C-alpha cells in the first residue's frame, strides 16, 4: 500500500487548531488530504491550508490556499507566524495572497507577538429572520465576496440551539459562490461568540473553538447596532479571545481587522492513504 507523505506544521490561534501543509501537492488533492488530516483519528485540526509560496517578490507572492478555497483569518495569522518563525519577513507590515479573497491581504506584526489581518470587506449587511425548528430568530446577514455569515444574538448558547443551527445549515441550498457559511451565535452581554463554520465543497461542519472571520463579523455587527466604530473589541470564544477593530466609512464601507496570537504546537510528517 502506497502512503503519501505530508510535511506539515500545526498551529494554535486562539484554540482554532490549524494545519499548514509545507509539501507540494496538486490542488485537486487538497480536499482529500485535508479531510484525512482533520480527522480525530489522524493529526486532528479544524482547518487545513496549503502553503503555495513563501517567496516575497515585491510583496505579492506570499500565497496561502485553504482546502476548500475559502478565506480564513486564523489560518492567515498562522501563516504570518510561520513566515516570521522562518525569518522570511523583512518588514512588520506586508501583504499576502489568500484563497477566497481577490485582493491582497494587508498584515502586520505588533508587540507581544500579536498578528493583525485586514479582513475581507462586507458587501451587504441586512437584518433578517431565520426560521429554525418552531422558532424565528432575528439575525444580521453579512455577505462577503466568497462567504456569508449570520450573526444571531442569543442570551445563552444551548445544545438545543446548536442542533437547530446544524439542521438549518444542512437543509439550505447555498449559492456556489459561498465557499463558507458561518452561523455566529453571539451573547452580547458576555461578548462571547460560538461560531459554526460550514464548508460546502468538503461538507465540513465544525463548531470552532475560535473564528477570525466570525470575529470580524462581530465587529460589523457592533458597527451596525451602535452606529459607531470599535477598536480592539475583545470577542471571547471557547478556545480563547480575538480582538477586532471595525469602522464604517460612507465611501469605503466596513473596514475591519482582527488581531490575535499564535503558537506552534507540532511540526513533522504525516502519512495518508
Swiss-Prot record:
It is an enzyme of class 5 (isomerase). It catalyses: L-histidine = D-histidine. Changing residue 47 to A: Significantly reduces histidine binding. The keyword Isomerase applies. The active site is at 72 (proton acceptor), 211 (proton donor). Its main location: cytoplasm. One of its GO terms (molecular function) is isomerase activity. Changing residue 72 to S: Loss of activity. One of its GO terms (cellular component) is cytoplasm. Its EC number is 5.1.1.24. It is found in: Cytoplasm. Keywords: Cytoplasm, Isomerase. The keyword Cytoplasm applies. It comes from the Bacteria. Induction: Up-regulated in metal-poor media. Isomerase that catalyzes the conversion of L-histidine to D-histidine. Functions the biosynthesis of the metallophore staphylopine, which is involved in the acquisition of nickel, cobalt, zinc, copper, and iron, and thus enables bacterial growth inside the host, where metal access is limited. Therefore, this enzyme probably contributes to staphylococcal virulence. The reaction is reversible in vitro, the enzyme can produce D-histidine from the L-stereoisomer and vice versa. Homodimer. Belongs to the histidine racemase family. This is Histidine racemase. It comes from Staphylococcus aureus (strain Mu50 / ATCC 700699). The lineage of its organism: Bacteria, Bacillati, Bacillota, Bacilli, Bacillales.
Amino acid at each position: 500500500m502506497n502512503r503519501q507523505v505530508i510535511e506539515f506544521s500545526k498551529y494554535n490561534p486562539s484554540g482554532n487548531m490549524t494545519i499548514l501543509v509545507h509539501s507540494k501537492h496538486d490542488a485537486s488533492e487538497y480536499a482529500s488530504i485535508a479531510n484525512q488530516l482533520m480527522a480525530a483519528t489522524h493529526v486532528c485540526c479544524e482547518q487545513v491550508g496549503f502553503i503555495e509560496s513563501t517567496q516575497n517578490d515585491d510583496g505579492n507572492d506570499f500565497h496561502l490556499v485553504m482546502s476548500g478555497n475559502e478565506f480564513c483569518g486564523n489560518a492567515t495569522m498562522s501563516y504570518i507566524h510561520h513566515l516570521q518563525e522562518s525569518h522570511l519577513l523583512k518588514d512588520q507590515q506586508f501583504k499576502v495572497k489568500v484563497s477566497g479573497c481577490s485582493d491582497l491581504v494587508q498584515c502586520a506584526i505588533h508587540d507581544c507577538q500579536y498578528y493583525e489581518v485586514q479582513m475581507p470587506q462586507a458587501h451587504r449587511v441586512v437584518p433578517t429572520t431565520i426560521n429554525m425548528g418552531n422558532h424565528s430568530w432575528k439575525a444580521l446577514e453579512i455577505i462577503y465576496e466568497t462567504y456569508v455569515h449570520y450573526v444571531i444574538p442569543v442570551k445563552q448558547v444551548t445544545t438545543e440551539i446548536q442542533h437547530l443551527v446544524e439542521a438549518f445549515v444542512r437543509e439550505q441550498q447555498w449559492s456556489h459562490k459561498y465557499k463558507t457559511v458561518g452561523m455566529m451565535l453571539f451573547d452580547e452581554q458576555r461578548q462571547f461568540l460560538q461560531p459554526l463554520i460550514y464548508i460546502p465543497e468538503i461538507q465540513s461542519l465544525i463548531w470552532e473553538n475560535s473564528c477570525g472571520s466570525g470575529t470580524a463579523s462581530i465587529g460589523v455587527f457592533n458597527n451596525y447596532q451602535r452606529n459607531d466604530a470599535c477598536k480592539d473589541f475583545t470577542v471571547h470564544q471557547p478556545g480563547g479571545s480575538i480582538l477586532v477593530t471595525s469602522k464604517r466609512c460612507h465611501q469605503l464601507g466596513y473596514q475591519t481587522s482582527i488581531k490575535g496570537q499564535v503558537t506552534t504546537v507540532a511540526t513533522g510528517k504525516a502519512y495518508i492513504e
